[in-house]
């Protein structure tokens, strides 16, 4: 476990109007909570997209013809890392605002809590976590619960939120 201050560069871009979206500072807080104790320096990008862009990306990269809530693209860096790279590049997270809003409403969650959960989820993917089988999924979900609890956010996997 890595302790100490985190140096974090989170670039956020929007592919749609920013209405009803969390502030950039919120995304940075959620990423920092995920990285705490795991990594001290990181550079990543978060892009908030509409359904059309979300669907196109999901089709292009996963061959699934629908928009999904979050996609993570871990950075593919050469080994050894270039000396000029002072902050490790983690990768990119793409979040589809209409899907996230729809899911939050269907699940009775606050929009902010759902964005927090999916930001944590996407960041964990950038760190190498997956949910390809039940064991991996259980471990990842437990870690998400712990991180979100530290942020004061309820268990996102409860049936009633």
Curated annotation (Swiss-Prot):
InterPro entries in the cross-refs: MetalPrtase_cat_dom_sf_prd, YbeY, YbeY_CS
Keyword Amino-acid biosynthesis: no
Molecular function GO terms recorded: metalloendopeptidase activity; RNA endonuclease activity; zinc ion binding
Location of this chain's protein in the cell: Cytoplasm
Residues annotated as binding Zn(2+): 121, 125, 131
Cofactor annotation comment: Binds 1 zinc ion.
GO biological process terms, semicolon-separated: rRNA processing
Its job: Single strand-specific metallo-endoribonuclease involved in late-stage 70S ribosome quality control and in maturation of the 3' terminus of the 16S rRNA.
HAMAP family hit by this protein: Endoribonucl_YbeY
Record protein name field: Endoribonuclease YbeY
UniProt organism field: Xylella fastidiosa (strain 9a5c)
Gene designation: ybeY
């Amino acid at each position: 476990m890595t302790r100490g201050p985190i140096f974090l560069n989170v670039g956020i871009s929007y592919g749609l109007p920013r209405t009803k979206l969390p502030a950039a500072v919120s995304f940075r807080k959620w990423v920092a909570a995920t990285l705490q104790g795991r990594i001290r320096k990181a550079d990543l990008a978060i892009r908030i997209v509409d359904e059309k862009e979300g669907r196109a990306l999901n089709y292009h990269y996963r061959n699934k013809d629908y928009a999904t809530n979050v996609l993570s693209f871990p950075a593919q860096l050469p080994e050894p890392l270039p000396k000029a790279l002072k902050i490790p590049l983690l990768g990119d997270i793409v979040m589809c605002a209409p899907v996230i809003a729809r899911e939050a409403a269907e699940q009775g969650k606050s929009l902010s809590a759902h964005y927090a959960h999916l930001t944590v989820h996407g960041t964990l993917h950038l760190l190498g976590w997956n949910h390809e089988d039940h064991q991996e999924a259980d471990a990842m979900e437990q870690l998400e619960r712990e991180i979100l609890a530290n942020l004061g956010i309820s268990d996102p996997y409860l049936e009633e939120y």
